[in-house]
Curated annotation (Swiss-Prot):
Single GO cellular component term: cytosol
Disulfide bonding pattern of the chain: none
Name recorded for this polypeptide: Uncharacterized protein C1orf198
Residue list for modification Phosphoserine: S37, S129, S175, S289
Pfam families assigned to the protein according to its UniProt record, in alphabetical order: DUF4706
Segments of skewed composition (Low complexity): 1-17, 162-176
Sequence ranges of Polar residues compositional bias: 134-148
Amino acid sequence: MASMAAAIAASRSAVMSGNRPLDDRERKRFTYFSSLSPMARKIMQDKEKIREKYGPEWARLPPAQQDEIIDRCLVGPRAPAPRDPGDSEELTRFPGLRGPTGQKVVRFGDEDLTWQDEHSAPFSWETKSQMEFSISALSIQEPSNGTAASEPRPLSKASQGSQALKSSQGSRSSSLDALGPTRKEEEASFWKINAERSRGEGPEAEFQSLTPSQIKSMEKGEKVLPPCYRQEPAPKDREAKVERPSTLRQEQRPLPNVSTERERPQPVQAFSSALHEAAPSQLEGKLPSPDVRQDDGEDTLFSEPKFAQVSSSNVVLKTGFDFLDNW
């Protein structure tokens, strides 16, 4: 600010020392424009120098001539003069200037939409490349696709799902120029299956959460049933699992009370004497090893939860992840 004030004061003193003193309005104007920016201050100083150069004749010149003199002195003779817009040299360098701008009629496809100039098109959320993109223009009809489309075969839903998954993987690996009408139909069936899977609710839905292993088997062509259609274990296996914990429960019954033991002391004594008379080898052969007992104990511990899991397979659904279902 100090340098600006000093420059303004210096220019004002230089102007005041000229032939004609500035009036109050010109002084305010000079102060205002000089305080805008350093470039504006430099321009005002140059104008005052031009005015001092002409002296008292400057006041007698018309305003248009004053502006012309200022422009000529500020720009300088070495600056190139503006060219005529119809100059032949400019037209050769910029051929777009030859035709009239803003009068080109643009038509939008087959629809009845026209507008002038490519810059005055109606607003659209899609770009021009997105609007002009089409798969049918890039597709090449293959003979195998034509035969497959002409001979439709009834397929099960599982095989349709496997074909849809195969077609989706094939479309990722193959290029766009191999697409055909059958590929579009397969992709449509794939999205239809996905929609049915996401819409299915309850244990009676056709497509329920498939695990990754089931998806892989569908890709291989194997038929995979959802959890609601899985066969339950045979009744014999279930009866065997039921009998095993029942026998264990019978073994774990409480001992008879003291009154019955007092009434029948003879069989207990006979059984204990028979045990003492038996050979240790026979006892080792009859009694199971501690490892076998431990295994039997573990089987008894885990047998009932397994039965509960089998019985509730229709109610509790799979999570959809192998590491959660099979750990």
